Amino acid sequence: CFHRRVASIIGRAADVSGAPVAVAAGLALHNLRRESGLDPGILTEHIVMGAVRDLDPLERELVEASNIEHLSTDDLVNRPDLVRAQIERLARVTDVIYVHIDMDVLDPREVPGHPLTVPNGPTSLELGGALTEMFKHPKVAALGIASTPANERDPDRLSLAAAYNLLKGALEGVRRRSGGR
């Protein structure tokens, strides 16, 4: 069953943007999770968080008490071997891998209209390179990009361009799969 064996690689869990991870993992709002058809929740050992740089104390406690794996910004940007190792680990225990990115994980210069940015994030091209590595694997099947500033919060369309860079990275990974599918 798809929803029983899906893995998430999460960009950042701060503020309410982390709520979907907690719900999906069965750590909060159990009725919401069940009503969405996700029962049981995703095992925390099937979740990898990347480039997390700013957790409030309660979030930090919850994440540290779980089996969530982590990839640092440096890992995502400079260690494709570690990215591949996490994807391979997840592929052994899941049917489908979902990659989720909250745009506030990026370098604040690329998402200037986002209220939750934190310094020292990867650029969209850097994270796009990590997405290329991830999406080379056939079990990496879905990408979510959330909280992209738009309209008056992105007058120069920098955030939109950053989101496109992420999509291009993922699509390049799919293109490089054997068989190109």
Name the predicted role of every residue range.
Residues 1, 25, 51-54, 72-74, ...:
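Short, structured patches in soluble enzyme cores that scaffold and shape functional sites
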Residues 47, 68-69:
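Short, conserved active-site loop motifs that form the nucleotide-linked donor/cofactor pocket
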Residues 69-181:
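Catalytic cores of soluble, metal-dependent hydrolases
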Residues 40-41, 45-54:
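An alpha-beta-alpha
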Residues 54-61:
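Short, glycine/polar-rich helix-capping loops at beta-to-alpha or helix-loop-helix junctions
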Residues 1-36, 40, 137-141:
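Active-site histidine-anchored catalytic micro-motif
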Residues 3-4, 54, 103-107:
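Short, glycine/acidic-enriched loop or turn micro-motifs at the edges of active sites
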Residues 1, 50, 99-103:
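Active-site flanking residues adjacent to catalytic metal/cofactor-binding acidic residues
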